[in-house]
Design a protein with these regions (language model features):
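Rossmann-fold cofactor-recognition segment
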Residues: 44-56
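Residue(s) in the substrate-gating loop at a strand-loop-helix junction
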Residues: 130
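Substrate-binding pocket helix/loop in short-chain dehydrogenase/reductase
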Residues: 86-87, 94-96
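Conserved glycine-rich cofactor-binding loop
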Residues: 5, 12-13
Length: 295
């Protein structure tokens, strides 16, 4: 892949860090986005100062990559964050901030690189989604909603640009060994009725991530999505992630609903326990300016 140029957002840790290293290892010239000049980047990665929430920043960053490298072959939309709490507990400001990063950040980046890719008549855009992009997520409902939106965007984009030589693909990690939960923002308007369930849910999430796989497995899926002659629309990643994806898509809705509620203990007075799917979202986000944590 010598000569190929990639942009990866959110490379300071987790999936973004592993992805940048994997692409460098495959011969890509990798530009990693960072909001600060002090951010430590993976070895072999070139820094581009860029904030996915800021259109002017993105335009300047993409222009810099084109000036330095002359082309863009791959965009990995990885930067993201999360808010932990029930839907009722999450403020509208937090919801807007989260969508501004997880959804609109990826959309801004995508729109910024597409003119160059169209001119080349080639390119690949990989979206880091999550199993929660097509599963319900008690106490991470806004995160799940942002990933559901991202999945719709990515699939639509792939159909729009395919005849132009540009492909889009989704990588859907399960639970991974990252700092994702510890860096999540807590919902702003906590309600006592949810406390036991919320706390227990977070504890189960932490237990699942402690025994989960390394983000390197996600990086390998990104490389496959980036280099395959005929990329798949989706790449579930993690222990049993493919099985969970299949159950979600092929079981009757009422049957899946019952299985899901049983796995989460949602019909009991006690707190729900996250299902042990080997999945979840990754990428260590850093503190955002307002409500969400961003990478």
């Amino acid at each position: 892949m010598d000569g190929r140029v990639a942009i990866v957002t959110g490379v300071s840790s987790g999936i973004g860090n592993a992805t940048a290293r994997a692409l460098v290892g495959r011969g890509y010239r990798v530009f990693g986005t960072a909001r600060s000049a002090a951010t430590v980047l993976p070895a072999g990665t070139e820094r581009v100062l860029l904030d996915v929430r800021d259109e002017a920043s993105i335009e300047a960053g993409v222009a810099e990559v084109l000036a330095r490298a002359g082309r863009i072959d791959l965009l990995v939309n990885n930067a993201g964050g999360s808010v932990v709490g029930a839907v009722e507990e999450t403020s509208l400001e937090q919801a807007r901030d989260l969508f501004d990063v997880n959804f609109f950040g990826a959309m801004r980046m995508t729109q910024a690189v597409l003119p160059a890719m169209r001119a080349q008549r080639s390119g690949r855009i990989v979206f880091i989604s999550s199993l929660l992009g097509f599963l319900p997520a008690p106490f991470a409902g806004l995160y799940s909603a942002s990933k559901h939106a991202l999945e719709g965007l990515a699939e639509s984009l792939d159909h729009e640009t395919r005849t132009l030589g540009i492909r889009a693909a989704l990588v859907e990690p399960g639970f991974m060994r990252t700092n994702f939960d510890s860096n999540a923002t807590l919902a702003a308007n906590l309600v006592g009725d949810y406390q036991q369930a919320r706390d227990h849910s977070r504890e189960n999430f932490r237990k699942n991530t402690e025994g989960a796989e390394d983000p390197q497995v996600v990086a390998e899926a990104v490389v496959e999505a980036a280099t395959a002659a005929k990329p798949r629309p989706r790449y579930p990643v993690g222990k049993r992630s493919g099985l969970v994806a299949g159950l979600r898509r092929y079981l009757p809705a009422a049957v899946f609903d019952g299985v899901f509620r049983k796995q989460f203990d949602l019909d009991f007075t006690g707190a729900p326990a996250l299902p042990r799917t080997g999945g979840g979202r990754t990428a260590k986000p850093s503190t955002g300016e307002r409500g969400a944590k961003v990478a």
